[in-house]
Amino acid sequence: MPILYSPENQVFHLQNDRISYIIRLVAGKYPIHQYWGKKVRAIHADVMERCCNQREEGFTLHELPLDTLPQECPVFGCGDMRQGMLEVRQADGSSALDLCYESHEILKGKPALKGLPSARGEEAETLVLRLRDEHSGVAVELSYSVYPDIDVIARNMRVVNDGEQAVVLERALSACVDLENTHAQLTTLSGAWARERQIVTRPLVPGHQGVESVRGASSHQACPFMALGKSTVTEDEGEVYALSLCYSGSFWADVFVDCNDMARAQIGIQPFQFSWELKPGDSFQTPEAYLCYSANGLNGMSREFHHLCGRYITRGKYAHASRPLLVNNWEATYFDFNEDKLLELAACAKEVGIDLFVLDDGWFGHRDVDNSSLGDWVDDRRKLPNGLQGLSDKIHGLGLKFGLWFEPEMISPDSDLYRAHPDWCIHIPGRMQVESRHQLVLDLSRKEVREYIIDAVSAAMERGNVDYVKWDMNRNMNMLHSDGLDSAHQKELNHRYILGLYEILEAVTSRFPDVLFESCAGGGGRFDFGMMHYMPQAWCSDDTDAFMRCRIQYGTSMVFPVSTMGAHVSAVPNHQMGRSTPLATRAAVAMGGTYGYELDLTRLPKEELDEIRRLNEKVKALQPLLLYGEFYRLCSPFEGSKTAFMSVSEDRREAVVTHVYGPAEPNRQPLLLPLRGLDAEKEYRDVESGRVYGGDELMTHGLTIPRAWGDYMATQFHLVAVD
């Protein structure tokens, strides 16, 4: 069984064939984290012997050493001097809790979370631990789900007010793990607009370290993920303990190293600017967190997260399907287009084997620049005299699918919607509004706003008979205040916004099950498992420069699979960086994502169009392997100027290897690149050259990479097993 309970020892053992996660009740009251790692039969060591420090007995604030015990649901105020998972302000103003074991339940399957995205789990098994503070009546349900086929534990917490007076949550995290600080380093993903998810590894030191967002979105600046390991951890060797979060709003991911070298790792909703009132009988559900253990380094960790996402988080028609090759008109035309120009671009796209034409920003209201019309999702008849329906009919008539851009969460001050409902935006009455990109944020905590968005977006999708939607969000939140909440509940706005967003996404994606949805947030500003639950892919970054995309996509692959990464071939010089890279390189890098084009095809010479046609044929033939193969990082752009990665089929009979140089250097010899994931006993043929290599040879000696000729040269190899 995946979950075993020993009543004599009061031990819960969550397990599959590869991992164990063990919880022990101490004194019959406190759930203690005893072990997490490689599969074991049992742990007999006494956690009390290990965690008691006799020299500090005189300073203990509790009958048990809560300040040193590795707790599953720690709280501050009754002996533990570290920050905890939960903080509840009670009617008398105090916040101390003494959460003690009350009961437990072991369930087949994995319950869904009401109002929140979560991983499916028909084959999983779930432990629910119920704890209670007798003084206040606050009760907690800790849920742990273990899967048979992936080395991930899904966790969440539900808080219930069973008392007689209202209480206020001021912190409610999703997961906490106390680990021995043999994990000497922390890896996170940080960045900014146009350089999202850069890999940052730092030594763990006493005190707090981690990543967070206070922006109302998971953000360009941080990703809700962190990984702990020894300093000897590599991509393929060493133990890694990682936490990630299925949530799209402000978050907090933190490791605190205490005076005893215990590392407390926690992740969940950002406590800053958060509170939530629970009246008697009310409950609060936290987002879901994922705890991943890998004995095979960071690559092993990534593949577990990729399997979690692909098998259990993404949903719908496109979760495991090939994706249409698209061209997006944004960098081809920006706001300056008409129907004739769009049809010219679409006709050219059809000629080179593209499947989907996407109309980006500027089709609605009177939006000739970015300072108007958001919220007015009505056709601009100046640009589209036949409306969306007329354009869509013509695009479909060419044999292409038709896609459309929206930014439904935003409102322009210069819009009919704002003139009719100025109170619908997030704002503080009496204060000057702070615009970003000339826009304000709609208040998704309000039912009437959510209903308007669902109806307006659905109507436009139906008019345009769309096959694809790009759902954008180009600014973060500030000036936090909702006219729909009283003064005592304003700190609920951030989370209520995200709950409102999820309600909208559930409604729209359910209404249009055959439409491919791609999320976007000024590029990769909301790239998280929460959005993946509703939309199987996300625009990875607004930066389409191939060399910078190597870093962005390499970092993104730490947590998210190739099938989620929106990646396009764009024009040169690149519109964000001014850099020029070869077409073959731009294509090779875009094949590390969902693949598409973001340029004016009508301006390209015949030779480039012919090359694009050949590339599209190649991508379509290889797409199942590229999107859904086992992904391995081989050479890090964060450790030099070169990047390499590969995808291997599940049966290990086929692989695609990509290597990208940085700026060329003189007098360099060809490189040897050791591969991963192949069958050591098989022979593999390079489809292009016809050369045959042994799998063991490729994984030890390596594959020869030709020396660079020109800056940013890419080389790809398609390897197929020889029968």
Predicted regions and their residues:
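Glycine-rich, aromatic-flanked loop segments that form ligand/cofactor-binding clefts
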Residues: P70-E72, G77-G109, V233-F251, C292-K317, ...
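Conserved, mostly hydrophobic/aromatic
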Residues: R18, M157, G281, V327, ...
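C-terminal beta-strand-rich structural cap/linker in extracellular carbohydrate-active enzymes
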Residues: G695-D723
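Aromatic-lined carbohydrate-binding/catalytic grooves of carbohydrate-active enzymes
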Residues: Y318-D455, Y468
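Polysaccharide-binding surfaces and accessory modules of carbohydrate-active proteins
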Residues: Y5, N9-H13, D17, P31-F256, ...
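Active-site neighborhood of glycoside hydrolase catalytic domains
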Residues: P385-G387, C425-S580, T594, L599, ...
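Short Pro-Gly-centered flexible turn/kink motifs
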Residues: V88, A96-Y101, W276-A295, M713-V720
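Carbohydrate-binding surface patches
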Residues: E235, P637-D679
